[in-house]
């Protein structure tokens, strides 16, 4: 665990654990299958994604703030990590350069529509498309450390527009919810059209 005022860096700890696993394998004291399985997990993209999200969520809190605030940040980071480990679509950190060209994606949803905020479209040839880290159907969880969960659409738009240099997004892939949302919006549009005729 990091000392007070020190950022959480789990990568070093994971590397050390892998070194110790390799040493234990060479000793022959433990069946190699179990050690190799654990080593594969620690070296997996999944574990790396969980680590990134944990560190990112933990970093959003001011280190000099109260113990309660730090504990809350640690709890949120732990929940994100456990959600990922239980097979839920795990959150990922995506960093995009912010240029005059924009970010190359559209969002939909928000509190006023009683839905999460989603990436509804990746613009072909745009920054997000060229980067490849975002997918249509990604739920937007935070923008540069500011949570947009349960927020109005406009807040997410403002945060995205205000970003300079780079924008750091935390997203989670949940395409079924996006499909349900789009279907609901299409039904609402159809009902409006019928009322107008």
Curated annotation (Swiss-Prot):
Coiled coil: none annotated. One of its GO terms (cellular component) is presynapse. It is found in: Cell membrane; Basolateral cell membrane; Cell junction; Postsynaptic density membrane. A motif (Kinase interacting site) lies at residues 2-13. The modification N-acetylalanine is found at residue 2. Residues 10-65 form the L27 domain. Residues 93-175 form the PDZ domain. GO terms for molecular function: cytoskeletal protein binding; L27 domain binding; PDZ domain binding; protein domain specific binding; protein-macromolecule adaptor activity. It holds the Pfam family L27. Gene3D superfamilies: 2.30.42.10, L27 domain. Plays a role in establishing and maintaining the asymmetric distribution of channels and receptors at the plasma membrane of polarized cells. Forms membrane-associated multiprotein complexes that may regulate delivery and recycling of proteins to the correct membrane domains. The tripartite complex composed of LIN7 (LIN7A, LIN7B or LIN7C), CASK and APBA1 associates with the motor protein KIF17 to transport vesicles containing N-methyl-D-aspartate (NMDA) receptor subunit NR2B along microtubules. Belongs to the lin-7 family. This is Protein lin-7 homolog C. It comes from Homo sapiens (Human). The gene is LIN7C.
């Amino acid at each position: 665990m990091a000392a007070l005022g020190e950022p959480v860096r789990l990568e070093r700890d994971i590397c050390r654990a892998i070194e110790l696993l390799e040493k234990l394998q060479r000793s022959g004291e433990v069946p190699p299958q179990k050690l190799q399985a654990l080593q594969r997990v620690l070296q997996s993209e999944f574990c790396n994604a969980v680590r990134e999200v944990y560190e990112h969520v933990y970093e959003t809190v001011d280190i000099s703030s109260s113990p309660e605030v730090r504990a809350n940040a640690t709890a949120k980071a732990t929940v994100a990590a456990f959600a990922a480990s239980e097979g839920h679509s795990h959150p990922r950190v995506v960093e995009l350069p912010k240029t005059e060209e924009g970010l190359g994606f559209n969002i939909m949803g928000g509190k006023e529509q009683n839905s999460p905020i989603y990436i509804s479209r990746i613009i072909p040839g745009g920054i997000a498309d060229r980067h490849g880290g975002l997918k249509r159907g990604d739920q937007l969880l935070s923008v540069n450390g500011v949570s947009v969960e349960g927020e109005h659409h406009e807040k997410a738009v403002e945060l995205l527009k205000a970003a300079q240099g780079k924008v750091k997004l935390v997203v989670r892939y949940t395409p079924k919810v996006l499909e349900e949302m789009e279907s609901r919006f299409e039904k609402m549009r159809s009902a409006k059209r019928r009322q107008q005729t």
